[in-house]
Every structure is written in C-alpha cells, then in structure tokens.
Amino acid sequence: LEGRKNRLSIRSLMKWIALLFIVIGLGVISFPFVQNQYVAYEQDKLLHQLEAEEVEEVSGEKSLTQRYEELNAILDQEAASTTSPETKEKPSKNLIGKMEISSINLELPILNGASMENLKVAVGRMSGTGIPGEVGNTALAAHRSYKYGKLFNRLDEVKIGDSIHIETGNHTYAYQVENVFRVLPTDLSVLKQPETGSILTLITCDPIQDPTHRLIVQASLVKTS
C-alpha cells in the first residue's frame, strides 16, 4: 500500500512538472507576440497625439559626431542582443510628427532624439540635424530587428523614386527617394548639411542580423502642403 502511494505521488509530481514546462513553453512562444502588441500600442498612442496636435517644436543642438557615435552604440547594442532588456524607461513624449512610406506599408511616429527608449517604439530624429521641411539634412533612425515590431525592417525594399511623407502638426512634407546605399558606421558624410534644399536621411542597421554597415535612404523635398 505504501509503495502504491509513493507511485501516485511521483506521478502527481511528474504531472505538475510537465504542466510547468508547458506553461513556460507557452510563455516563451507568446512573448514576441505580446511584445509586438505592446510596441504597436505605444505607436498608436503617439500617432493619436499627432491627431490631437500635441506636437513639439525642435531645434538643433550638440555635435553631430557625438550624436552619431551614440546612435551607432544603440543600434549595435540592440542588434547584438537576443532578449529584450529589462527597463522601466519610457519613450520621451516629444512627438514631432509621423512618417509614411506607402511602398513598404510603413507608418510610424517620429520622436525628437534617437535615444534607446525612443527607438524601441518609433523613429528618432537625430538631435543636431535638420528639421523636416526646412533647409538642411534631417536624419531619422530606427531599428531593423525583430524585437521591437517592424520599424525599418523593410527599408531595404525602398526604391529610387519612392515617396516618403512626413506629417507634423501643421504641414505635410513630400520627399522623393534619390539614393539608397550602404556605408560603414563611421561614415559621417551621410549627415552633411546642404546649403540649400531639404534632405531626408533614413538610417538603420544592415544586415538585420550581425550588422556591419548602415543602410541609408536619402530623399529630397519636392512638395509642402
């Protein structure tokens, strides 16, 4: 009788262990989906801010070299990581607009500053670069990984001649893609500021896994409305 009780206890324990492994497995499988839903939720909140005209004015500051080094460190760190880091930081609320690239079905909020927190849910404007619609070179960066939703994952599909629209609180700026190329992370020439005209420069990692370069998409302003 005692032996039978022991066998029943062992079976019961094994059932609980099996159930525990099932729960853990479901958690691992569902985590990317839950995380992507959270990112989508944060993006929707930011886009609704734009509709409510809660848009912030921006101005240039700090050295471009320092800002680009900081951006490269963030892009490389996130690309090398295989798990989402634990953080209580929230993206800053300084929404400056949204970006649409219809050719790749992309619509994303744009936040002022390419910080780690901002780039988890949105496109970040590199501080010290131009302002959308004005004379200068506006540098916008985003991740190209599978951890934070889609973001710039399909940026390599953009072609010369494609349209990019930047909407701020008062205006919509239409840019036309003129160049798509790759550079080393240390190449600062992509941030060169023109004396005339408004340029848009999109920056992300390339390739998605173990990136060695930066994928660059540059476009020129063709219409303001």
Where do the language-model regions lie?
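Solvent-exposed, non-transmembrane regions of membrane-associated and secreted proteins
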Residues: I10-K15, F21-S225
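N-terminal Lys/Arg-rich, disordered targeting/topogenic segments
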Residues: L1-I10
